Amino acid sequence: MADYKIHLLCEEEGIDVTFNCAEDTYILDAAEEEGIELPYSCRAGACSTCAGKVTEGTVDQADQSFLDDDQLLAGYVLTCIAYPSSDCTISTHVEQELY
């Protein structure tokens, strides 16, 4: 089973951290295990509270039901139901960008 390096960034929140995440672990769960506090609400991919934007790398978020095709193409991700499929960099706390 592969582990990937996840780099989270949010200048406003003072977040600039890298941690390992297994390919079968949700990014939000792995961040919490590292003591990183990220926003979340439903934990089911049905809202936008945990939204991030992938700026490098790829994720698998097939379980999400909230983001539309344009948002997915733009790189938005719901960290509560996203598995890493490569090393990636994600900007966090971007929910307001979706509206």
From Swiss-Prot:
Reported cofactor(s): [2Fe-2S] cluster
Molecular functions (GO terms): 2 iron, 2 sulfur cluster binding; electron transfer activity; metal ion binding
Signal peptide annotation: none
Pfam families xref list: Fer2 (PF00111)
Single GO cellular component term: chloroplast
Segments forming domain 2Fe-2S ferredoxin-type: 4-96
Gene3D superfamilies for the chain: 3.10.20.30
Location relative to the cell: Plastid, Chloroplast
Entries under InterPro entries matching the protein: 2Fe-2S_ferredoxin-like_sf (IPR036010), 2Fe-2S_ferredoxin-type (IPR001041), 2Fe2S_fd_BS (IPR006058), Beta-grasp_dom_sf (IPR012675), Fd_pln (IPR010241)
One GO biological process term: electron transport chain
Binding locations of [2Fe-2S] cluster: 42, 47, 50, 80
Superkingdom in the source lineage: Eukaryota
Note describing how the cofactor binds: Binds 1 [2Fe-2S] cluster.
UniProt keyword terms in alphabetical order: 2Fe-2S, Chloroplast, Electron transport, Iron, Iron-sulfur, Metal-binding, Plastid, Transport
Function: Ferredoxins are iron-sulfur proteins that transfer electrons in a wide variety of metabolic reactions.
Similarity field: Belongs to the 2Fe2S plant-type ferredoxin family.
Subunit note: Forms a complex with heterodimeric ferredoxin-thioredoxin reductase (FTR) and thioredoxin.
Protein's name in the database: Ferredoxin
Source organism per UniProt: Pyropia yezoensis (Susabi-nori)
